[in-house]
């Protein structure tokens, strides 16, 4: 039976709407998990990056405070000023402790490269190993400080807070990796810290040499962490570029 023209047009329009809705549904269902909220969309990956960056800011402030405290508190100021003086005189041991950090970072991922996504995955893994490199040294720092006499609570509490924030930042980065690259294989390669034996030594000067190295490295490297977090957030989420 031939349909009247108006009815045929209506049926055709209905079919087009149905197909359009189906395609729209397929497109929406392919978008990564994003929870609808009033005023926009809540993206867990973006929020985890925001959380990681907030921890990075906290680490920078804590590292700055610990660094300053160790230089000016009576507990450690004499040893730190002596080490700084040796550093200026180019004493080999002091130069090594004052300028060398066992964790290193390469250049940031290049967004113009043909394999930008591969590069981004690579640098996310590298940042995980970079942050993870300080988990063990900070753990031992807290243990050794807790066992030393006359340790100011301000120094011990900051060391504990830095360790806690490092662990939480590492958890954030690992979570991002599993969500953005679910099939990625992550091999944790945390380099050993050469000053660990100094920190665990019964010799007080050796302990302070290790703290001199750790505090300088933690202080300087928080800036790199924040830079890499911003770069990776831009590459992965397209936000805050």
Curated annotation (Swiss-Prot):
UniProt entry tagged with the keyword Signal: yes
Signal peptide from the UniProt entry: 1-30
Keywords carried by this UniProt record: Disulfide bond, Glycoprotein, Hormone, Secreted, Signal
InterPro entries the record matches: 4_helix_cytokine-like_core (IPR009079), Somatotropin/Prolactin (IPR001400)
Family recorded in the similarity comment: Belongs to the somatotropin/prolactin family.
Pfam families in UniProt: Hormone_1
Residues with attached carbohydrate: 213, 220
Localization: Secreted
GO cellular component: extracellular space
Tissues expressed in: Detected only in placenta.
SS bonds (residue pairs): 34-41, 101-217, 234-241
GO BP term, example: positive regulation of receptor signaling pathway via JAK-STAT
Protein name: Prolactin-8A9
Presence of keyword Transmembrane: no
Molecular function terms, GO-annotated: hormone activity; prolactin receptor binding
Top-level taxon: Eukaryota
